[in-house]
């Protein structure tokens, strides 16, 4: 009896019920994501890399595609909240847009995010734009990271921002930034919010350094007069003063401490993931931040960015997205919850009480509820149609392979299509469902089956890295000869 036996009608009915319950009872876990950032000078091949895991109990993993297009002046675009399909309103469409594959566009711009929520009342329920819509609208309109920051924040100010606090990774082929943003407190006059928009700060990650964020604001103090390296909204400090959130000097203002105060969950469930990345790849002894990552000492914050002890490769940053805190004090293979097969997963809840004691389950980078994940790679030494690659995967990163897709591609594989299956509709040709089946099988005996699955993934990805190098060479030769049609065929890899 094969794996198909677990996908009978009864289990599909159970899945529908479970998904409904998750929507109702697990809203706080709905969008828990991880981003890792590697600058040109910190990578082995001088590419800029951004990773993203879209973690949600209800997100179906697909690769979206927005073809480049031209629109007549005055055309309006309808906006639907990302992941919920709730109609929010409409805004003017740009007269021309860029090709977008996943979270990258044809100019090698990458945008990703992680949600941290922040102060509950700093949300505009009447805003037309949510963070997800803003990401994909910006990707269709911006060429560079700096232009993306300008467009992203201007959209919020002009049309209203209906999401809560977010950390946004924005990178191009030369620079990488973290933008942190939260809404303003609404002020309703005659039924209209006259205080729409957002407060925000963006910091450039210095070349040669790496960074990350995982559902917790990380920008503390920032330079007030250094636009090469830091940009911010004019009212980011004054709005905090108006709300009684801050009363100190401007130069001492900390965005994260003001708009996203730390608590145990933020440190242990969120910052610990960033600590794991730094612990593995950064210079120095990271045990000095264990009390912070453990949720015990909020005063011992980690730096926003770090210098790696050795340059980081594409494969290494991809494998970091498969991290379960192995060989650290948070290693989940070593406690009773791992069972007899060293399972590095804890299903839920993240904490619970037993005999008056609170027990905490770790939240690693790799998790069972990932919808999709990727490593975006921007390569400045190649022309844009060839340089941008999104290495894309679906379901749990620990048991799913990455597929390279050039961001100039004009079509998406049916196996990753949003039209192929859904979270409650099984499709045997859907990559999400295939990877989900493999993951469920691996969870049964993780130290045996999971190890074998990982070996297959490693071999496959190493082969694809070599194939892409050959494909790049072929595409570049065709591109230099001006044979655009053949070049487009080449990047269908």
Region locations from a protein language model:
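Sec-dependent N-terminal signal peptides
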Residues: 17-26
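Glycine-rich, aromatic-lined ligand/substrate-binding cores of catalytic
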Residues: 241-389
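Sec/Tat signal peptide C-region and signal peptidase I cleavage site
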Residues: 28-32
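Positively charged n-region of N-terminal signal peptides that target proteins for export
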Residues: 8-17
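A contiguous strand-loop segment
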Residues: 33-131, 151-311
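Histidine-centered catalytic/metal-binding microenvironments
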Residues: 454-493
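Substrate-recognition/cap regions that form aromatic- and gly/pro-loop-enriched pockets
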Residues: 340-469
């Amino acid at each position: 009896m094969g794996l198909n036996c677990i996908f009978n009608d009864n289990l599909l009915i159970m899945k529908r019920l479970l998904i409904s319950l998750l929507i109702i009872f697990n809203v706080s876990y709905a969008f828990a994501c991880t981003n890792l950032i590697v600058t040109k000078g910190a990578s082995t091949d001088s590419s800029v890399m951004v990773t993203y895991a879209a973690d949600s109990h209800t997100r179906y993993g697909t690769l979206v595609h927005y073809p480049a297009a031209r629109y007549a002046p005055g055309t309006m675009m309808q906006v639907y909240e990302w992941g919920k399909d709730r109609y929010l309103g409409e805004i003017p469409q740009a007269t021309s847009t860029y090709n977008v594959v996943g979270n990258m566009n044809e100019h090698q711009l990458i945008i990703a995010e992680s949600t941290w929520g922040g102060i509950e009342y700093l949300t505009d329920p009447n805003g037309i734009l949510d963070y997800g819509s803003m990401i994909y609208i910006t990707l269709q309109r911006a060429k560079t990271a700096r232009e993306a920051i300008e467009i992203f924040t201007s959209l919020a100010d002009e049309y209203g921002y209906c999401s809560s606090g977010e950390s946004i990774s924005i990178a191009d082929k030369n620079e990488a930034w973290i933008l942190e943003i939260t809404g303003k407190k609404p002020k309703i006059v005659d039924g209209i919010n006259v205080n729409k928009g957002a407060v925000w700060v963006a910091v450039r990650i210095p070349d040669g350094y790496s960074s990350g964020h995982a559902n917790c604001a990380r920008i503390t103090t920032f330079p007030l007069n250094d636009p090469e390296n830091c940009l911010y909204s004019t009212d980011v400090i004054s709005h905090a003063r108006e709300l009684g959130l801050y009363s100190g000097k401007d130069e001492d203002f900390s965005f994260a401490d003001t708009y996203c105060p730390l608590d145990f969950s933020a440190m242990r469930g969120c910052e610990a993931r960033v600590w794991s990345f730094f612990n593995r790849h950064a210079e120095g002894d990271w045990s000095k931040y264990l009390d912070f990552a453990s949720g015990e000492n909020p005063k011992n914050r980690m730096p926003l960015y770090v210098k790696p002890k050795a340059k980081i490769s594409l494969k290494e940053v991809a494998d970091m997205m498969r991290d379960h805190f192995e060989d650290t004090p948070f290693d989940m293979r070593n406690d009773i919850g791992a069972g007899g097969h060293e399972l590095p997963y804890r299903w839920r809840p993240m904490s619970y009480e037993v005999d008056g004691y609170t027990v905490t389950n770790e939240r690693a980078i790799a998790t069972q509820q990932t919808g999709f994940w990727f490593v975006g790679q921007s390569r400045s030494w190649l022309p844009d149609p060839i340089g941008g690659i999104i290495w894309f995967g679906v379901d749990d990163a620990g048991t799913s392979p990455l597929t390279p897709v050039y961001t100039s591609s004009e079509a998406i594989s049916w196996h990753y299509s949003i039209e192929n299956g859904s979270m409650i509709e099984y499709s045997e040709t859907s990559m999400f469902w295939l990877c989900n089946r493999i993951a469920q099988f691996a969870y049964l005996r993780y130290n045996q089956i999971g190890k074998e699955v990982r070996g297959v993934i490693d071999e496959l990805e190493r082969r694809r890295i070599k194939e892409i190098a050959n494909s790049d060479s072929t595409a570049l030769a065709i591109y230099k000869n001006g044979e655009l049609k053949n070049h487009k065929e080449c990047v269908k890899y």
